């Protein structure tokens, strides 16, 4: 009888994995004479091998054509951002006109809040989760202050109500109902960055819209990780980074979604020339005529060199399909959970919810003994070539990414935890 928690079984799962060839499409950092055990794609995804060729293509076109590369050549820069549009739309469950790759997450969040946060005397509050990613909180507080409002009275935080610091849907629903008449905006993550908890965005949208509030989402840890259905869910706007699960490189261009019901609206916006309607953009008319859809929120011409790695990665997402990636992800993370509970339960506490629908690929882990022990284990793993990441005050995040991680990687991780505990 096969031991389902043995390395031999993990090797068999890897051999039978229909997505196993995708691993070869990525460049792995090295640890001595072997690949690192890279379990930190939730922080920075690996480099797609095709990225170099696509960046070189842009460089070659620049060298050969100069400024003419905007309008001629194999990939005209005028419309280069549209080369990633359709694939991005498939990843987030949107119509092509609802998405655009531009700026970075925090910049896009400010742009979206300038349009969608419309406070009135009666309705000016913003609802977020307690412990939101700091940049989101900074953005929200600064948007409130820009409008002469006090975050102490207009920023509402929903506190965790579950033992490991996670949030029940009931707590979110109660907060929306309690503060509904005051709410102008609900800003919510697809996945909470520290706990790894995934949220039912469709239900949050339903509850918020019933109260008359707009809904925006930070999808930094959700995009490319879990299936998303932004259009059908009715989210007003969403923003994300592309350097985590979408593997577009450090500081990569971000992404933005605007629901099609706002495509031709007269929402106020911070405007720039690249958001002007494409057919008349180069007439340089003084009157701003926005492009329909999300592209109407662009400010400047796209960073083509930064878009090239994203284009390379999205080709792999199309090759695999989100459904197949999610199926493998659930198996990988489930296997990691089983290994931890069976072999190192006295060392690691799993913070992330156990239900597959309430998490993505990431497991957030607390180490018995507190922060000092946690840092000791984290440094041991790093020295052994096993990469996760650390989030204060006491969480190690481990994220088996289905594009390139293997079941055997999880045994390497747990084996190193055992080695540290035995030392």
Swiss-Prot record:
One of its GO terms (molecular function) is kynureninase activity. Gene3D superfamilies: Aspartate Aminotransferase, domain 1, Type I PLP-dependent aspartate aminotransferase-like (Major domain). The keyword Hydrolase applies. The modification N6-(pyridoxal phosphate)lysine is found at residue 244. It comes from the Bacteria. It catalyses: L-kynurenine + H2O = anthranilate + L-alanine + H(+); 3-hydroxy-L-kynurenine + H2O = 3-hydroxyanthranilate + L-alanine + H(+). Pathway: Amino-acid degradation; L-kynurenine degradation; L-alanine and anthranilate from L-kynurenine: step 1/1; Cofactor biosynthesis; NAD(+) biosynthesis; quinolinate from L-kynurenine: step 2/3. The keyword Hydrolase applies. Keywords: Hydrolase, Pyridine nucleotide biosynthesis, Pyridoxal phosphate. GO terms for biological process: anthranilate metabolic process; L-kynurenine catabolic process; L-tryptophan catabolic process to kynurenine; NAD biosynthetic process; quinolinate biosynthetic process. Pfam families: KYNU_C. Transmembrane segments: none annotated. Its EC number is 3.7.1.3. GO terms for cellular component: cytoplasm. It is an enzyme of class 3 (hydrolase). Pyridoxal 5'-phosphate binds at residues 105-106, 133-136, 218, 221, 243, 273, 301. Its cofactor is pyridoxal 5'-phosphate. Catalyzes the cleavage of L-kynurenine (L-Kyn) and L-3-hydroxykynurenine (L-3OHKyn) into anthranilic acid (AA) and 3-hydroxyanthranilic acid (3-OHAA), respectively. Belongs to the kynureninase family. Homodimer. This is Kynureninase. It comes from Xanthomonas oryzae pv. oryzae (strain PXO99A). The lineage of its organism: Bacteria, Pseudomonadati, Pseudomonadota, Gammaproteobacteria, Lysobacterales. The gene is kynU.
């Amino acid at each position: 009888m096969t031991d389902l928690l043995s390395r031999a079984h993990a090797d068999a799962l890897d051999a039978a994995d229909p997505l196993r060839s995708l691993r070869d499409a990525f460049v792995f950092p090295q640890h001595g004479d072997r690949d690192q055990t890279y379990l930190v794609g939730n922080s920075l995804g690996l480099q797609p091998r095709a990225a170099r060729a696509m960046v070189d293509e842009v460089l070659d076109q620049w060298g050969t054509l100069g400024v003419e590369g905007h309008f001629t050549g194999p990939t005209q820069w005028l419309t280069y951002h549209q080369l990633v549009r359709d694939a991005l739309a498939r990843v987030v469950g949107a119509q092509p006109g609802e998405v655009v790759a531009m700026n970075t997450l925090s910049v896009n969040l400010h742009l979206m809040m300038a349009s969608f946060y419309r406070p009135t005397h009666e309705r000016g509050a913003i609802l977020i989760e307690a412990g939101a990613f700091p940049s989101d909180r900074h953005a929200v507080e600064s948007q409130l202050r820009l409008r002469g409002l006090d975050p102490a009275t207009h920023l509402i935080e929903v506190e965790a109500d579950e033992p490991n610091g996670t949030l029940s849907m009931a707590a979110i629903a109660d907060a929306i109902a309690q503060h509904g008449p005051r709410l102008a905006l609900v800003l919510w993550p697809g996945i909470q960055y520290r706990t790894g908890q995934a949220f039912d965005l469709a239900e949050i949208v339903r509850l918020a819209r019933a109260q008359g509030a707009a809904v925006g989402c930070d999808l930094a840890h959700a995009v490319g990780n879990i299936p998303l259905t932004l259009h059908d869910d009715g989210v007003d706007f969403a923003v994300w980074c592309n350097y985590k699960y979408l593997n577009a490189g450090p500081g990569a261009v971000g992404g933005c979604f605007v629901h099609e019901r706002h495509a031709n609206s007269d929402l106020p916006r911070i405007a720039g020339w690249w958001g002007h309607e494409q057919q008349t953009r180069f007439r340089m008319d003084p009157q701003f005529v926005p492009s329909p859809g999300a592209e109407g929120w662009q400010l400047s011409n796209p960073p083509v060199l930064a878009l090239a790695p994203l284009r390379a990665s999205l080709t792999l997402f199309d090759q695999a399909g989100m459904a197949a990636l999610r199926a493998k992800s659930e198996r990988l993370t489930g296997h990691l959970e089983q290994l931890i509970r069976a072999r190192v339960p006295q060392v690691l506490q799993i913070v992330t919810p156990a239900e597959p629908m309430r998490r993505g690929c990431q497991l957030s882990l607390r180490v018995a003994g507190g922060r000092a022990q946690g840092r000791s284990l984290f440094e041991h793993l790093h020295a052994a070539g096993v990469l996760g990441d650390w989030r204060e005050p006491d969480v190690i995040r481990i994220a088996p990414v289905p594009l390139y991680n293997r079941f055997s990687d999880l045994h390497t991780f747990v084996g190193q935890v055992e080695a540290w505990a035995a030392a």
